[in-house]
Amino acid sequence: MTLSRVHQQVIAFPAVNTAPVGYLPDPASINKLQIPTSSKVSMLQKKKTDSFTNGARDQDKLGPKLTETVKRKLSLGAKILQMGGLEKIYKRLFKVCDKEKLFKAYQCYLSTTEGSIAGLLFISSKKIAFCSERSIKVTSPQGDLTRVHYKVSIPLCKINGVNQSQNTKKPSQRYLEVVTVDNYDFWFMGFVSYQKAFNCLEKALNEDEQ
């Protein structure tokens, strides 16, 4: 099946990476809204739902471990210092455009059809980009097993909107849904700093529109 041009630009499929397995520390853990045409974020609001999406089920599985998020955050900070800072990690993992500025990176999980994947969500002045903490096994076109990092890269100009959702039965379970102009959606959950991540993404989108 041929992917649309937008989909090709949005998704960076897993690619072999020379980084060591587990470039980040093991984590101690780990609805929809009409998109306004005038602004991507001016009308953002939360929508609660009783139905369980794949993302909700994923976070149910993660729930018991979320009590250790403080330890997880401290471990991440130590590892980032060891690697030389977020900028170096970001440039090592993704292609950086001219004048692109990295704002922040947040530990979270990306929901996939195969389950949730722990990693870092980078937010910059040009895109959001996710990379799994650990490499995963995939089969190459030649039929060989290889280990790769799972990556997703979405240019800000291809984001149609960002929605906040939460589980009505478990309000502490909160999600960010990123919807592209081609109507593909990406669910992020299990944030150590959920509101800070949303505010940072909102700021990036606002600045991109200016």
UniProtKB/Swiss-Prot annotation:
Protein name per UniProt: GEM-like protein 7
PANTHER family: GEM-LIKE PROTEIN 2 (PTHR31969)
The organism of origin for this protein: Arabidopsis thaliana
Domain GRAM: 88-166
Matches recorded under InterPro entries: GEM-like (IPR037848), GRAM (IPR004182), PH-like_dom_sf (IPR011993)
Coiled-coil intervals, chain numbering: none
Transmembrane regions listed in the UniProt entry: none
Pfam families: GRAM (PF02893)
Entries under Gene3D superfamilies matching the protein: Pleckstrin-homology domain (PH domain)/Phosphotyrosine-binding domain (PTB)
Family, similarity comment: Belongs to the GEM family.
